[in-house]
């Protein structure tokens, strides 16, 4: 009797687990179909019942009270934009206290790898968040900072005693400060970050004891918390061999942060075996293309071609226009149409789209710490035009994936590019982007030849609710209105499979002047963008050097011709004046 009972129980448990989805880990190929919403836990949402207007000044570098429960309570808000993955800031115990460098609300000053950060909640509450995410088919990308451990300074008084599990100096490289000026690889990978007040001791990633401990640790984290993917922080500061071992131990999708404007440098990590990296080499060209910088869309096309040449698989790279370290897209760009074009590029271009929290609310702050605002101060506005735009593009992207099996593995083709526009096609999806701006009242037309289209084929613009017919010569002419982006898909596919796109986004847009408040929360704006010199920004000089080196590039030729033209006009007038003097 007991034997039969045990057999029945075993069969019962087997049947039960057969119907429970396995969420612990997903491959790079699976992640290509996802889109990611990046969150800083402390700044996303307060506990239920907390005062929603609680002050949070990013400049103070203090904990503001966001928790894992807060995230769980606002998953409807995230799903309303169509996201099916979130990237959350590091979860492990950080140094305590508030010194001149502030507090560790961001999670990157790890001091104990075996305990969670109590400021964000308990282990049970974190597990409840994971369970609710997976119940909704939302994956979690966990941010991990393991190349260094945080120790309170000053240097002469520091102690490894509270650093867990590496509580001895033998587990770290000898102290030296990273030399940012020399770009020496030995310094970058073996010296320390931080400062005299907060030291980020550089873990000896060549030490086999350290490697063994971290391999077991990361494997356990993935299994214990049902993690779907991992984001490695600051991969530039450790050898590629270290990250490959960590990635193999995790046995799930991994994406690294390599802060560089060079496609060759970044792609080398992927080509060596790492699944993916955040596409910094494309970030700056995207920003400049849809801003007032003078480089515009032709420079973006050059960057695209460079990355295509250097990388093995661009469709798994993380595409973004902002994060917790960089200025928000609205900081130097207050033109609503251009911002919409930048967002559309991220959502429709090759790779995994990543949207930093607050982008959907048009937060307009500068870099760290200003760009780490409290989202609750926006009241989680689901009527904002950018919130709606992201939702439409996310749902459209999902619908296309269901219809076109190889969509996520197909590279986009540039059909047309000029200084003010770029047209790309990915299977049957055609994206027309421009930087004319919302003030351009002229109805501008762009003509291009879609791949695989026949005369009289019709395309539907899901953003502007317009239909276009292919001409007898195989070309398609679209009209740019107020500088808004255009996303086209065959009308037959829209009508049969995408009925939700029969309504347009634009009639719902209310254009109102920007209102800047202390939280950096602003409404959509009609103002022109602010210009800035790209060479003043990290990675900007690298890209500028690469771009200017390509003398055959059309953009550079155009600038050269303009300069020659000015000289030819100016010199004849200037010479008589010089002679008279």
Curated annotation (Swiss-Prot):
Which N-terminal residues, if any, form the signal peptide?
Answer: 1-24
Where in or outside the cell is it found?
Cell membrane
Q: Which Pfam families match?
A: A_amylase_dom_C, Alpha-amylase
Q: Which GO terms describe its molecular function?
A: alpha-amylase activity; calcium ion binding
Site residues by UniProt (Transition state stabilizer): 325
Q: Where is the lipid attached (GPI-anchor amidated serine)?
A: 551
Q: Where are the transmembrane segments?
A: none
Q: Which cofactor does it need?
A: Ca(2+)
Q: By what name is this protein known?
A: Alpha-amylase 2
Provenance organism: Schizosaccharomyces pombe (strain 972 / ATCC 24843)
What is the taxonomic lineage of the source species? Eukaryota, Fungi, Dikarya, Ascomycota, Taphrinomycotina
């Amino acid at each position: 009797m007991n034997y039969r009972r045990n057999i029945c129980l075993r069969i019962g448990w087997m049947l039960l687990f057969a119907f429970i989805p396995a969420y612990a880990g997903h491959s790079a190929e699976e992640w290509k179909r996802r889109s990611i919403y990046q969150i800083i836990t402390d700044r996303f949402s307060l506990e239920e019942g907390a005062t929603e207007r609680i002050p949070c000044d990013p400049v103070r570098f203090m904990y503001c009270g966001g928790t894992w429960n807060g995230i769980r309570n606002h998953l409807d808000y995230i799903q309303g934009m169509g996201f099916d993955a979130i990237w959350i800031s590091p979860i492990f115990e950080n140094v305590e206290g508030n010194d001149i460098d502030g507090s560790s609300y961001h999670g990157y000053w790890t001091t104990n790898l075996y305990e969670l950060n109590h400021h964000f909640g308990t282990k049970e509450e974190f597990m409840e968040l994971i369970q609710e995410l997976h119940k909704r088919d939302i994956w979690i990308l966990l941010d991990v900072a393991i190349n260094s451990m945080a120790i309170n300074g000053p240097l002469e008084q520091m102690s490894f005693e509270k650093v867990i599990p590496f509580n001895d100096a033998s587990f770290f490289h000898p102290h030296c400060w990273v030399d940012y000026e020399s770009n020496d690889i030995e310094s970058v990978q073996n010296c320390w970050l931080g400062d005299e007040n907060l030291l980020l001791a550089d873990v000896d990633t060549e030490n086999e004891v350290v490697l063994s401990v971290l391999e077991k640790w990361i494997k356990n984290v993935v299994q214990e918390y049902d993690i779907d993917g991992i984001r490695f922080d600051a991969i530039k500061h450790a050898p590629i061999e270290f990250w490959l071992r960590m990635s193999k131990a995790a046995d799930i999708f991994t994406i690294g942060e390599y802060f560089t404007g060079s496609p060759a440098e970044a792609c080398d990590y992927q080509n060596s075996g790492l699944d993916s990296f955040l596409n910094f080499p494309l970030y700056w060209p995207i920003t400049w293309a849809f801003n007032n910088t003078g480089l515009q869309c032709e420079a973006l096309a050059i960057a695209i071609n460079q990355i295509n040449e250097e990388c093995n698989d661009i469709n798994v790279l993380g595409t973004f226009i902002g994060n917790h370290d960089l200025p928000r897209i609205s900081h130097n760009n207050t033109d609503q149409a251009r911002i919409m074009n930048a967002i559309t590029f991220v959502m429709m271009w090759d790779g995994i789209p990543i949207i930093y929290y607050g982008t959907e609310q048009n937060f307009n702050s500068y870099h760290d710490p200003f760009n780490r605002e409290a989202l609750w101060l926006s009241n989680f506005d689901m009527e904002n035009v950018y919130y709606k735009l992201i939702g439409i593009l996310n749902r459209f992207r999902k619908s296309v994936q269901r219809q076109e099996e190889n969509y996520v593995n197909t590279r986009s083709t540039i059909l047309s590019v000029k200084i003010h526009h770029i047209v790309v096609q990915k299977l049957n999806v055609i994206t027309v982007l421009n930087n004319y701006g919302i003030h351009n009242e002229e109805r501008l037309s762009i003509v291009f030849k879609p791949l695989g289209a026949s005369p009289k084929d019709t395309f539907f613009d899901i953003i502007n609710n317009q239909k276009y017919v292919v001409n007898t010569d195989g070309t398609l002419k679209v009209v740019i209105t107020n500088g808004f982006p255009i996303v086209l898909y065959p009308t037959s596919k829209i009508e049969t499979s995408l009925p939700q796109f029969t309504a347009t986004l634009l009639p719902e847009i209310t254009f109102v002047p920007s209102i800047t408040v202390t939280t950096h929360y602003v409404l959509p704006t009609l103002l022109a963008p602010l210009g800035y010199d790209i060479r003043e920004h990290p990675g900007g000089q690298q890209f500028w050097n690469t771009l200017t080196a390509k003398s055959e590039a059309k953009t550079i030729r155009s600038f050269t011709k303009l300069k020659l033209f000015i000289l030819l006009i100016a010199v004849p007038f200037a010479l008589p004046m010089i002679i008279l003097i």
